[in-house]
């Protein structure tokens, strides 16, 4: 929890300083926002240590006006391979539990969210799968559009949905990467063979003409 003082004194989204912590990731003052600076430093250390293997960043929030569990995802360009993959992860979550709403999820970083943790990890550290998960303070909507009140057990359920979905997605993702890698190696070997195998010389003997 990055905002224990704000939670303890009953603030909705601000710390004891009265500022929204999730809008301070690019300009954080170490004296005023020590927790944000610490998280930025940790993320940078992990990126330096694991490089491109540091692929995921999740943060969890509550939402006062929308229903259910949904996410704000990364903003990849449509020609990027991540464009569909980051959406496939969210779609997998929806299929695993009706609490999660793919329709409510958004995969852009709007102007007023460009200083959030998600934006910092995506554009600053180039982490491809960056998500802010939002869980409603009140209800979630079933497939039949019935509103169901949320309780503390549903909060635990939401955490389980995210983690189990992440595990399932990683298995599929790794398997697909293995297949693509194997195919790429096969194509490379065939290309090497085609370059090293000599072509048969064409005969230079002219055919004799019939009398």
Model regions: which residues?
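Structured catalytic-domain cores with a bias toward divalent-metal coordination
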Residues: 1-211
């Amino acid at each position: 929890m990055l905002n224990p003082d704000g939670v303890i004194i009953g603030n909705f989204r601000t710390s004891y300083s009265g500022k929204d912590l999730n809008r301070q990731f690019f300009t954080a003052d170490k004296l005023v926002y020590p927790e944000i600076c610490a998280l930025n430093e940790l993320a940078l250390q992990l990126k330096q240590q694991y490089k491109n293997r540091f692929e995921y960043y999740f943060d969890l929030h509550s939402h006062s006006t929308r229903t259910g569990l949904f996410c704000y995802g990364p903003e990849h360009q449509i020609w990027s391979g991540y464009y569909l993959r980051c959406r496939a992860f969210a779609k997998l979550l929806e299929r695993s539990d009706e609490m999660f709403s793919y329709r409510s999820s958004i995969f852009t970083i709007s102007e007023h969210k460009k200083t959030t943790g998600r934006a910092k990890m995506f554009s600053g550290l180039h982490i491809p799968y960056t998500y802010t998960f939002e869980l409603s303070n009140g209800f979630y909507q079933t497939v039949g559009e019935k509103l169901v009140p949320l309780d503390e057990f549903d909060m635990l359920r939401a955490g389980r949905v995210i983690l189990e979905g992440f595990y399932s997605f990683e298995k599929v993702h790794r398997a697909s990467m293995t297949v693509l890698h194997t195919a790429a190696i096969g194509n490379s070997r065939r290309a090497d063979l085609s370059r090293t195998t000599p072509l048969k010389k064409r005969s230079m003997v002219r055919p004799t003409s019939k009398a």
